[in-house]
Structures are given as C-alpha cells and as structure tokens.
Swiss-Prot record:
Encoding gene, per UniProt annotation: apeX
InterPro entries according to UniProt: MMPL_dom (IPR004869), Mycobact_MmpL (IPR050545), SSD (IPR000731)
Function: Exports the siderophore petrobactin.
Signal sequence, start to end: none
Protein name (database record): Apo-petrobactin exporter
Disruption phenotype: Deletion of the gene abrogates export of intact petrobactin, which accumulates inside the cell. However, growth of the mutants in iron-depleted medium is not affected, and virulence in mice is not attenuated.
Length: 743
C-alpha cells in the first residue's frame, strides 16, 4: 500500500534522532549563506524607479535630459522663513553662508548660485509676496550617494549654526525667529532614507516583542512562545542572503518598504504556520505516549493545510510580477521567497525543536495521555485530576452555526456589506510626500514653499512638442484653460530645434487629484493643434512631463495593475482551492467571502483613517496591497478550517462535521489571527503613512476574517448548502440521515 507523502515527511523529520540532523543542516546552511552571500539590507536601492520607461512622463524626462539638459546637478532647496517677514540680518546670513560655501565647497557640491554677491535689496525682491520666505538652491553631483549627501547636509547645517545663536533647523515652525529647512529632491531623499532605516529597527523590535507577548498570553508557556520566533529567525537567516544574492546579481530589485513589510509578513504568517502544527501536536500528545508518533501524526494532519496555505500566499503574491508599477513588482519575489522558505521551516526545523524539547515545550501545562497522568498521580500519591473540557466558547459557536445558519449569514453579510458600502467614498492621493510625517524637515520646507509661493510654479507641467518646423499656436491653446495660471515662452531643443518645451503653471495644487485630471485635457488640446496643422500621428510628437504628469502616470498604471492582478490572483487561488478541496461550490463561496472581507476591511479602514485619524486621503497603492495580502492570507484560515470539516465529513454526518470543524480549529485560528493582525498593526506605529494605512487596513481585514468570516459566515454557508458544499467531489455523494436546520 502506497504511503501518504505527508506520512513519509513525518517519518523523515520526526524520526528518532533525526531532529539533530535537521537542526544541524539548518545551522550549516544558515551559516554558509550568511558568510558567503550579501544580506538583503545591504542591497536595497535607495531611490528605485516606480514608473516604467514607456510611461509618457518618463519619456518626457529622458527627452528633457537630451534636449534641455540641466548640468547644474541635483538641487537642494534651502528654505529660509520668518513669520512676520525676513529681516536684514537674515539676508546677511544667507550671503555669509553662500560666501563660505563658495570658498570651501561641500564634498559633492557641483554648482552654487552667487547669492553672496547679490545685494540685499535685490535678494528681497525674490522672496515670497508676503516677505516671509526665501528659497536658495545648492546643487550636488548626480552620482552622489545618499550617505555622502547626508554628510554634506550635516556640514551645511554646521556652517549655518556657526553663524547664529540658536539652531534654526530645530526651531519649531510656530515658534518666533528664523527657521531653516532643507528640502527639494536632495533633502527629501536623505530624509526618506533616514526615516526607513529608523523604521526597520523599530519595526523588528516591536514585532518580536508583540509576537512574544501574545504567544505567552495565549499559550502561557515561555518555551512555546520562543519556539516560533526561533523558527522565524532561522528562516530569515536563509531568506536574507538568498534575496541578497538575487539582488546583488541584478535579478531582482529590493527597496526599504518591501523589506519592512516582508519582516511583518514573516513573523505573522510564520508564527501562524507554527501554531497550526503545534496545536495538532498537542492534541496527539494527549493520545500518544510517544512524542515521535504524536508529531508524525500532527505533520500528516496539518501538513497539507500548511503547504496549501503557504502555496496560496506564494502564488498569490507572485502575481505582483505582472505589475508595471515598480513598488508592486518589487514586492513579488521577496515575499514569495520568504513565505516559501518559512513554509519549509515550519515543517522541518519546528518539528526538530519540538522533539528536542518534547512535552516540556508546553511547560507548565504539559499534555499527557490518560495513562501517563494516572502513573504520575500514583507516583505522587495524588488523585488523578479530571481535566475540564476546553473550548467552551468554540462549542457554543459551533452549536449556533449549525442551528441558526441563515440568521448568521444575514447578520454577517449585513455587517460586512455595511462596512464595504464606504469604499466608494474613499479619497485617494498619489503624492508620496504626503506619506511622510508632517514634521519631517524636508516636508516642512516643501510646505513652506507651497504655502508662500505659487503652487503651480512649484512644479510646472512640461509640455514638449516636435513642431516639424511649423508655427503652432500651442501657447495660445494652453492659455485658454481656466486651470492654467501661466504658460512660459517655449524653449528650443539643444540638438533638434524643432522640439519645443512649454512650462505650464497650474492654478491649483500640482499634486492634487484635480491637477492630475487636467493632464489628459492638456494632451488632447495639443493633439488638436497638431491635427489642425495637418501633422499626423500627433501622439508620437507630444510628451508631457513634470511632477503632475508623473503622478498621473502613477495613477493610470496603478489602476491598470489592479485590473490585471486582481482577476489573475483570484483565478490562481480558485484553481488551488479546486485542486485541494475537489469542490467547485466550496471554491466559489470561499473566494466570495474573502473578497467581501477585503472590501469590508477597506471600508472600515477608511472610517478609522479618515474620521478617526483625520487623514484626508489614503495612498492610491493601498487597495492592491491590501487585496493581495488579505485574499492570500485570508484563505489560509479558510483552508485550515474547511480542511478539518472535509476530514470530519468522512466519518461524521454533515452538521457534526461542520460543528466539530469550528470547535477543533477555533482556538488556534483565533490565536493565529490575533498574532497576524497584531504584527500588521505594528506598522501603524511607524511615521510613514503608506505603511500606517496598509497596516491598519490589513489588520482590520485579518480580524474580520478571524472573528466573522472564518467562525461564522463560512461554516454557516457550508451548513446551508449541505452535501452540495462538496460538489462535485466524492463527499457530495455521501448519504446521511436528514437533520433539521432551523432558519
């Protein structure tokens, strides 16, 4: 008789003395990879591109570098601000600072405007209309790395501070006196990298502590609380150099944001997989005296669900490879590799640790068989204690589910549907600067510029055209729009004089959704000019660039990725469920319930973020991030519980199979859900809004799955469908006596 593959796996990893071999292999591989390959943190790209080269704004940027080159370098914008108006001493300070920068340039300084020689009266004319703000640039070499730039900015701060009594960089904006902020591309870049580097350490420490505390509270065993963390640690010891190797060879690209979220996913999902096996192991320890036999049975019983859950997440997250938006695409491989290795760790090194510690791993609540308890009581000359039945709440829940399935379905759908109804009201933003803390120096400087200077002049739209040698009324056409403030006279290309660039200042905030919506109007109006002039293929003679155009492309590409990835991911997970459960009906309602849970989480997240935390909008990337994680991880819990119902149905009638499935998986899935939600909630403590928003929405979604979808909605639907829940599998043809189900 052919043995089950999971039975063979159990014999392999949970045989006598194999635990030491398994542990030795893991230690050897971890040490070998750690000392021979780079760690993933050393291969992160500080400023990876998100838009593809085919995007119109990126084509415009490439053309501008060729035809309208700016050899000055990367700009740092030094913002000088004093409420009530800049004073003579402030302009004198600016002159002195630039005089010193001219005499002793910063290491990577490339170009410096001559502010040291410009009279105060002339300088003051370039200040904001209210006289409170003045912006001076310092240009740096484009090849300069972030670390070197950070040192240069520190040197600049020291120069300014050496000429004043009180540090103007640390003075709060609302306080009296001179304020200086470093903004622009260089200031934002250095602040962002510093922010993410601080977030990495904070995130790791907070996640480890949270998981440890939750495990101790839930299982009341110090050893059991540490084991999942050890397993995750070993998994990370292989994941980090593996990803570092792939990134070092240019096969993948990784960024700080992806690594931060991967850390959370690893601890959350990894701990869940460990708990699935540990809970089964504990059950079998109550029946089997041999820890080896108990663990082999546990691996056979839970291994399929763990493998299926990990495979669902791996393939689900792998669909992000289809994304054109860089931030999405960079998530795919690191996350899939991390979960794949974590799944292997849960079924190999975790059993090794469980065998090494044996029953002691559950100390002080050690699980023993009845005969072992009797023997222990005899030796201690005590009466055998009759253990109270655990899981009373799960039993009541199971009873309610099978007795009142329609009531539960209507109530849960009403709650989830009510939350989902807020999704159409969500406002989105694609301005990444809004994702950073309001008190981040470069953002404060940027806010000062936008508040005291024309918003449109801050980031003009660059309209570039190939006139084909014709006189075209493009400027006049662009000036007709009410949302256009000014249009500068065109500049001619350096190499091709027929190429012209118009700088268009918008009347509204160039980073707003309203401004993004004007880009197609500008494009259509210029194409009309081409058409009227008899120039064919107008779309090939026109490029629109600048920050507003880049954000417009971001919006378009993000929406394209959602339209492609969501149906592909649903199809892949549906196929996996069909293969695993052999039921078309179950596949459909499991997918539908998780998708409903996603929309509910998005609606609930908006309620909390907008009305509770005052966020005017959420980042446009959040829906796809949340969908991919919630659908993949949400199916984990469904798979674990439904596989238990399917197993029970082989020996029990339908209602008992569902009821016992809820009871048997209740505590472990609740524990796993709390831990996973907790780890994502840790993201909410970070100063980076895109991570805060993602963490909150995902944590809410996990909680909805844990406490509503998994224990109530899914089993209630299974009860109502009866044997059709298994159709067309063999279980759908299994006969049973009819049992009454109350509506």
């Amino acid at each position: 008789m052919k043995k089950h593959p999971l039975h063979m796996l159990g014999r392999l990893v949970a045989g006598k003395n194999t635990q030491w071999i398994t542990l030795s292999v893991w230690i050897l591989i971890t040490l070998l990879l750690s000392f021979t390959l780079p760690q993933v943190n050393s291969t992160k790209e500080p400023n990876p591109k998100n838009l593809p080269e085919t995007a119109m704004s990126q084509q415009a940027e490439a053309l501008m570098k060729k035809e309208f080159p700016n050899n000055a370098g990367n700009p740092l914008l030094v913002v000088w601000y004093r409420d009530g108006g800049l004073q003579s001493q402030d302009y004198k300070l600016i002159q002195d600072v630039y005089k010193e920068l001219k005499a002793s340039p910063l290491k990577e300084q490339s170009t410096l405007p001559p502010f040291d020689t410009i009279p105060e009266q002339v300088l003051s004319k370039s200040a904001s209309k209210d006289g409170t703000s003045f912006v001076t640039p310092v240009f740096f070499n484009k090849s300069a790395g972030t670390d070197i730039l950070k040192e240069n900015l520190d040197d600049l701060r020291n120069i300014v501070n050496s000429k004043v009594d009180e540090d103007p960089f640390k003075r709060k904006i609302n306080d009296a006196g001179l304020h200086v902020r470093l903004s622009g591309p260089v200031g934002i870049q250095t602040d962002a990298v510093s922010l993410f580097s601080q977030a990495d350490v904070k995130l790791l420490v907070a996640t480890v502590l949270l998981v440890l505390v939750l495990l101790i509270l839930l299982y009341r065993s110090p050893i059991l609380a540490i084991l999942p963390l050890l397993v995750v640690g070993f998994a990370y010891g292989i994941i980090s150099p593996t990803l570092g190797f792939l990134a070092d060879h240019g096969w993948i690209k990784v960024d700080a944001q992806a690594i931060s979220i991967m850390t959370v996913l690893l601890f959350g999902a990894g701990t869940d997989y460990c708990l699935f096996l540990i809970s089964r192991y504990r059950e079998y320890l109550l029946e089997e005296e041999s820890k080896y036999k108990a663990l082999q049975l546990a691996i056979k019983a839970s291994g399929g669900a763990i493998i299926m859950s990990a495979l669902t997440v791996v393939l689900g997250l792998g669909t992000l490879l289809l994304a054109h938006y860089g931030a999405f695409h960079r998530f795919a491989v690191p996350f899939s590799v991390a979960v794949f290795i974590m799944g292997i760790a849960a079924l190999t090194i975790l059993p090794a640790f469980l065998l090494i510690f044996g029953r002691t791993a559950f100390f002080p609540f050690i699980p023993r068989t009845t005969s072992m308890n009797e023997e222990l009581a005899r030796r201690k000359k005590k009466v055998v204690k009759v253990k109270k039945s655990k899981g009373a709440f799960s039993k009541k829940l199971g009873d309610v589910v099978v007795r009142r399935p329609w009531t539960i379905i209507m109530l849960t759908v009403f709650v989830l549907g009510g939350l989902a109804s807020f999704v159409p009201r969500i406002q989105y933003t694609y301005d990444l600067l809004e994702s950073f803390p309001k008190d981040m120096p470069s953002r404060e400087g940027f806010t000062l510029i936008s508040d005291h200077f024309s918003a449109g002049e801050l980031a003009p739209v660059k309209v570039i055209v190939d006139t084909k040698g014709k006189e075209l009324p493009i400027k006049e056409e662009l000036e007709k729009f009410s949302f256009v403030n000014t249009v500068k006279d065109p500049k001619e290309g350096k190499e091709n004089k027929q190429i012209q660039m118009y700088e268009v200042s918008l009347a509204e905030n160039p980073y707003s959704i309203e401004a993004l919506d004007q880009i197609p109007k500008l494009k259509n109006s210029v194409e009309k000019v081409f058409k009227d002039a008899g120039i064919s293929n107008a779309e090939d003679q026109l490029w629109i660039g600048g920050e507003t155009a880049s954000l417009y492309d971001t919006k378009q590409i993000t929406e394209r990725d959602e339209a492609v990835i969501i149906p592909v991911m649903i199809s892949i997970i549906a196929l996996l469920l069909l293969v695993y459960l052999r039921s078309i009906v179950a596949m459909i309602y499991l997918i539908v319930t998780v998708v409903l849970s996603f929309f509910s989480a998005l609606g609930a997240g908006w309620l909390l973020l907008h009305y509770g935390m005052g966020a005017p909008a959420i980042q446009g990337a959040i829906p796809l991030y949340a969908f991919v994680f919630l659908v993949a991880l949400g199916e984990d819990y469904n798979i674990f519980m439904v596989s238990e119902i399917w197993k029970n149905r082989k020996t029990q009638n339908h209602l008992d199979a569902v009821k016992n499935g809820v009871i048997q998986t209740g505590s472990v899935i609740t524990s796993a859900g709390l831990i996973l939600a907790g780890t994502f909630a840790v993201l909410g403590t970070l100063p980076i809004q895109v991570l805060v928003q993602f963490g909150i929405v995902t944590a809410i979604g996990v909680l909805l799955d844990t406490f509503i979808v998994r224990p109530l909605l899914v089993p209630a639907i299974t009860v109502v469908l009866g044997r059709f829940a298994f159709w067309p599998g063999k279980l759908s043809r299994k006969s049973e006596e009819v049992q009454k189900v109350d509506a």
